[in-house]
């Protein structure tokens, strides 16, 4: 988050100040990439397309930092849904994925994760074990920091559905993490024995 | 609900990783982003002004629709009074435009009639035969594809259209109010916005009184007045005095 400076930075960026824009970009792009990584691939491309759209609309944007984040992530989601459609079209399965869902879940893998020093990419991969909506809502709520109503609008669900998805998602993640922790400490113990 | 799961200590390492500061790799795209930012600066003013003008267009359309609806209310009464007061033979002009589209029922048809007749009735009659009925859709479609409306408004065909609408700036609203026979109306300005609003108040007024006139009666009265309603005004052709402002 940029915080107090945000209004000033945004207005400077709006008038063409590249340094100000770079600050906005640096602040948000990592989170944006992590969010877009829920699709599993092409996060960089989709992020670049997102910024392309954002810079074109920047002069007309009005709002505070939360509104800014909501706007950027709404744009990102549209691009991600488009990219998802292209993928399914390329896979010659146009009838699938009509929901507009673009998140691809993953099965648990057996990679050894050192839980205390997870990379953000590994963390996103763990989140992707959740059902798509839960994964997306958890990231938007907990990592991007959007409100329930903003997330609801963004994903096209009711606030109630978003609350439930966030709650269950976090519960599921806690379970995954504690199981992972057990597995890891077990294997660590085994290694010490042998 | 149980305690907020976000407080579960098992989640802490995961959340920490998800919220971790940017990795080097995640900042790689900055150059490309700044380039597109720079490119957008060059083209930025036009988009924003276009957006502004679109807002005005929409506002204008809304306003036009409102005026049309008002005109229907007042004009409907006026027309009824007019009809009952005068001999049908002597005043075919009032109905001409209305009868041109008796098949296309509905509120917007009534609204369209009113926008033209609600104004100085003489001027409006001049337009009736051309810009109402089936021709209107074609004209509106053509209009929606014209880039320079200022110039286009002076073309003979569009002159009738703008006259019917009450000005080139009102054509979009007028076209939007057309019944969607060929679906052409939606091709104009803000598709979603227009059709929703006004028509509900409209239908009360007219339909019963409309069919009296025969379109065939119209032409004789027509040529006396010029349909030029373009705001820019062609002084050479016609003084813009007959401008139907939509005030009944």
Task: Annotate each predicted stretch with a short phrase.
Chain A
Residues 77, 81, 134, 143, ...:
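DNA-recognition helix of helix-turn-helix
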Residues 13, 32, 36, 43-54, ...:
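Short, small-hydrophobic-rich alpha-helical interface motif
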Residues 27-30, 38-39, 139-147:
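Short helix-capping/turn signature of helix-turn-helix
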Residues 15, 104-139, 144-154:
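Amphipathic alpha-helical segment used for protein-protein interaction
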Residues 3, 10-34, 41, 135:
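A short, charge-rich alpha-helical start-of-domain segment used by transcription regulators
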Residues 11-15, 38, 49-68, 86-90:
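Sigma70-family region 2
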Residues 2-6, 90-120, 147, 190:
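Internal acidic/polar
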Residues 38, 59-63, 73-98, 116, ...:
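Arg/Lys-rich amphipathic alpha helix in sigma70-family domain 2
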